[in-house]
Regions:
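Extracellular/periplasmic catalytic domains that process cell-envelope and extracellular macromolecules
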Residues: 45-49, 121-124
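A short alpha-helix/helix-coil micro-patch that ends at or immediately precedes a cysteine
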Residues: 34-42, 59
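Peptidoglycan-targeting cell-wall enzymes and recognition modules
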Residues: 8-30, 58-158
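Short helix-to-loop capping/linker segments positioned immediately adjacent to catalytic or ligand/cofactor-binding
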Residues: 41-44, 116-118
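Active-site-adjacent structural elements in enzyme catalytic domains
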Residues: 47-62
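N-terminal secretory targeting signals
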Residues: 1-8
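Solvent-exposed, polar/charged alpha-helical surfaces in well-ordered, non-transmembrane soluble domains
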Residues: 33, 37, 51-54
């Protein structure tokens, strides 16, 4: 391809530590230093791509403070957010009473590689991106050379 850029042709952009701290005040140098190699590994080179990644991580993890998905829904909110998976307010009320694991299994069960009973909870949102579903854990694990599909709690450490 005539217009394709090689990796060496791309300018590398990374936010300064001060910019990082402004966006993620609860973190420190350790997290910042862990973040920089990920930019290189996953070819997040440009300011636009870095900004998009940081915005996504910030939104999904409440500023890198929530590294595991909460299922603290009211029945009304559960029905509003997941109307395809939760069909009625009565069903939402039953799920909320049963707790977070039941909610996760209904919302995430039976799709994107989640096949076994309990997979919705097992492969719930974790990490800065709130990675969900077995298939995504397997893909991310392959990219990171980590056994995320068999040890999903490792995502919280990334």
């Amino acid at each position: 391809m005539a217009n394709a850029e090689s990796k060496s042709d791309r300018a590398f952009y990374a936010p300064s530590y001060e910019q990082w701290r402004a966006m993620f005040p609860q973190t420190g140098m350790l997290e910042y230093r862990a973040f920089l190699p990920a930019l290189v590994q996953f070819e997040i080179w440009t300011a636009d791509r870095v900004a998009a990644a940081l915005a996504q991580w910030s939104h999904e993890s409440r500023g890198l403070q929530a590294l595991e998905e909460s299922f603290a829904y009211t029945p009304e909110r559960l029905l509003a957010v997941f109307p395809v998976r939760v069909k009625s307010l009565a069903e939402a009320e039953r799920l909320v009473k049963r707790g977070p694991e039941a909610i996760a299994n209904v919302i995430y069960g039976g799709r994107f590689g989640n096949r076994a009973a309990g997979d919705g909870w097992r492969y719930r949102g974790r990490g800065p991106t709130q990675l969900t579903f077995y298939d995504n854990y397997a893909l991310a694990g392959a990219a990171l050379n980590m056994p995320l599909a068999t040890q999903p709690d490792l995502v919280k450490l990334i």
